[in-house]
UniProtKB/Swiss-Prot annotation:
It is a multi-pass membrane protein. Its main location: membrane. The chain crosses the membrane at residues 9-29, 35-55, 72-92, 95-115. The keyword Calcium does not apply. Coiled coil: none annotated. Keywords: Cell inner membrane, Cell membrane, Membrane, Transmembrane, Transmembrane helix. One of its GO terms (cellular component) is plasma membrane. This is UPF0299 membrane protein VP1300. It comes from Vibrio parahaemolyticus serotype O3:K6 (strain RIMD 2210633). It comes from the Bacteria. It is found in: Cell inner membrane. Belongs to the UPF0299 family.
């Protein structure tokens, strides 16, 4: 029982180390290259490609990822509080925000539909 808990803790720590390591690599790449893509996104891509190439196994990352997903709602609390503090600004800009969200979604939807149509026609 204690041995199992200790093993789970070690697996969780390894998982968190891999996730935070990918984040650190992403931030470092972003700082050295100066690209406008956030380091966290680059870190996610680093982790994704290392898992795709088989350098990192999914089971190694799963305990930490599950923990983050389980408590993800807590990460939205500061954002929600910030939005409520600036609600008047949010309300004043509601139309551009809604228009950009709907417009962006439509652009993505149409682009993916065209791409899928092209790829399916190419196979047949």
């Amino acid at each position: 029982m204690i041995k199992d808990r200790f093993l789970q803790l070690i697996q969780l720590l390894i998982s968190l180390f891999l996730i935070m390591g990918a984040l650190g690599i992403g931030i470092t790449i972003q700082k050295f290259t100066g690209v406008s893509v956030p380091g966290s996104v680059i870190g996610m891509l680093v982790l994704f490609f290392s898992m795709t190439l088989g350098l990192v196994k999914v089971d190694w990352v799963k305990p930490g990822a599950t923990l983050f997903i389980r408590y993800m709602i807590l990460l939205f609390v500061p954002i929600s509080v910030g939005l409520m503090q600036h609600f008047d600004m949010l309300l004043a800009n509601a139309l551009p925000i809604i228009a950009s969200a709907v417009g962006g979604s439509l652009i993505v939807l149409v682009s993916l539909a065209w791409l899928l149509d092209y790829l399916l026609k190419e196979k047949h």
